[in-house]
């Protein structure tokens, strides 16, 4: 396999950083590291030496199929005017039957002006084989490797054309029109995020089921928001590779109007849908999913732990 050529400017920055580290100028070293990462590379220190590696897998073209190495490599529609009422985003990884069940429910009850984006995030061979083929209402976007939940959501958002984006987990089976009630909720400018399942917390530390009505956050089973807000407030933090608690973080980002200003609302709206087994949870051993959940929750506390104005019903 051919090695990826390191650009001259990146290599020069790496040597400058090595000199800064030798001089114990840690601030300069950190600043240069950020420049290297912004250029799409990561630096690994090896004593006084270093190694440079691409920050993301490469984007690969196989005939007419493109597999993207990062969310940022996916062409974005966010600068274009919205077209249509909503875009539903589904992330496909390892469970083709779950994706097909969710798609069947959407197809049976699709509303005019609704498009669908399936993000095949490093799909298993079985999932890759079962991805929807030529369908004018469904776009499939593939990644080279498993990028993680936040990156997959970013991919779907970048390809969304509808004025509202609905991220629908494949464990959810629509039994009716799940789009219209959420679009209607977001017609209220005081609402920043809406969905079928909400949770509440008095302190942003412990959450319990809440709704219908005003809640603290919307769960990622069905979470809807304005495409324009995603463009203005995104992208999502891609350190959230595991799905758990990303929905809380994104809900708070969408609600936050800044300290001293009343936050926007999160509203749970009844939708005609059935929740099935969430395989992203049950497929992992309990210690591993608890570890990953805690890591994600610390990111919420780091950013919003002091924001008691965001606690309680939004």
Q: Which ranges hold each PLM region?
A:
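Conserved donor NDP-sugar-binding/catalytic core segment of glycosyltransferases
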Residues: 173-208
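A conserved acidic beta->alpha catalytic loop
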Residues: 120-129, 172
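A short, conserved alpha-helix in the catalytic core of glycosyltransferases
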Residues: 181, 222-234, 239-271
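Short aromatic/hydrophobic "clamp" motif used to bind/position activated sugar donors
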Residues: 165
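Short, acidic, metal-binding catalytic loop of nucleotide-sugar glycosyltransferases
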Residues: 104-113
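A recurrent flexible, glycine/aromatic-enriched loop bordering the glycosyltransferase active site
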Residues: 150, 207-228, 241-243, 285
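C-terminal, non-catalytic tails of nucleotide-sugar-dependent glycosyltransferases
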Residues: 66-86, 192-196, 200-202, 224, ...
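Glycine-rich, basic loop-to-helix element that forms the pyrophosphate-binding segment
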Residues: 143-160, 209
